[in-house]
Amino acid sequence: MPLALNRFPIEILRMIFDYFWAHEILYMFFNINDHFNRILFAYDQYRINFQSIRKTHFDLVCRLIRPEQVISLILADQKQTPCQSQLFQTLFRIEKFTRLRSLKLIELADDGQSLLSKLYKLQRLVSLEINIRFDLPLIKALPPIKTLIINLPSDVQFDIRRSIGSLSLEYVRHLSISYCSFGAFLHFFNEMPQLKSFKTSLFLWKPMEVNLFAYIHKIQITPVDLVSLSLTIDAPALELTNHHFELFLTPFQRLQQFELIIKTYLDHEFLNANHWEKLIVEHLPKLMTFNFKFPASFDEREIIDRFRSPFWLNKHWFVAFDSQSQRLFTVPHFASTETRNSIQSVSSDWTTLPLEQHSIFYDRVNQLKYESGQSEHPYRYNHVKKLIFNDPYMYDNIVDLSKIKTAMPCVNYLRLNCSQTSLRNKYFPDISLPQIRRLSLPQFGRRKEKIQFNWSKVFPCVERLTASINSKNQIVFLIDHFNNMLDGFFVLDEYHFDKIKITREWLKQHSCRLKREKKENGFACEINDKYSFSLCLWMSENK
């Protein structure tokens, strides 16, 4: 096989490499022979994705790749990869990545401050994405980037202009910010004349701001050449009207994609399909995609029926009404990806989607939650990846668990929100679920007495584990019991208030698996014990 691969032209191999991440390329092709190693060492288009990566793959990439070979980099200090950015910065200096074009920072421990202050040196950087953990550091200078994405925590709000207000943003063409105040909204529109796509959640707290939003084009310069616009708007109840949006949208004659989510109560006239049709035909001639989700409370089928006109059906802009969530939305774009055991069939009275396409409502579901007293599901969810059991009497539903292999072949995440006493071997006869790679046990630490249960028999291939604990010994037990575990997140159970103090050295001394690790950085851990206790662990494969 290596001899046959040697006949491949280098140009073809480089084209193949362009479809894979750096760790995938190195894992597949490194050390096949000297010829391939020379190709790998000369390749200069590596895209590194360290999000949720295996520790061994992280080490492989850091060992073999030089900074000047990298054009894209993703760093993440998430639960699955604690202390990653710190490890990375002990090996590399970001300013050495002279060919870097795209950078994504995900929940870094210092929110990226140590890296962001040096990005102005990377003159080839055109795309920057930051997922903030706590706060966005002050960014004084950036190269002339074209794409800027800032994802903020949902429970943290601040004026983003404090961090990026002094930046020159004239070259930005694509902007996405989780949320912004109306003042920040005005700032971005004024400072980005070349903007082509914009996505944000906008808070209009006062009726005056709603009016200013509508008349923004008369107040200041705006990027009327927008091609893609995605807005989530929260405003005082019943303040937003069709007229406001007609004034706001009319200048965007080149708009091709439009997504609109409204979170506040609306007048029924806002849901009038005829009005939206008139607005689009007269002022948005290039619009190809229109997705929306509006709060709605109505019993009249007339509102749905207006969306059955040839205009909507010919464009395949189908809508549906969900009486439980009280939402009117486009499908399949906003069709739910999660469901509980109380799912009901979708009536044609409440959707314009053709009957033969109703399977979309079930095929899009990738998370299924079983509640107590679960009855059989009337539908087969072939694409479910996450399965959640919220049932204190787990053994009543083991028959459903045993069907996972055949009925839900895509499931790889399982959450068992039930007491340990419900998890006994006699309730799991001959069940083995090697497809489960991510396991969550939120009540594992609820009881102190030892429960005899063969976890490795039922879940032999778990790689990512989340569990509550009530002692240090439970952490060691779980690390050593799940032989294939690559990362773990352990949190002190809410019913146990005993302080847990633990160190990296203690873990290595008491865990048989970690004790066998010879490399100094063979595993990484982040211990948080200031107020409560949690431990993030990132390990190499068990040898």
Question: Where do the model's predicted regions map?
Answer:
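Eukaryote-biased activation of long, low-complexity terminal tails and linkers
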Residues: 1-543
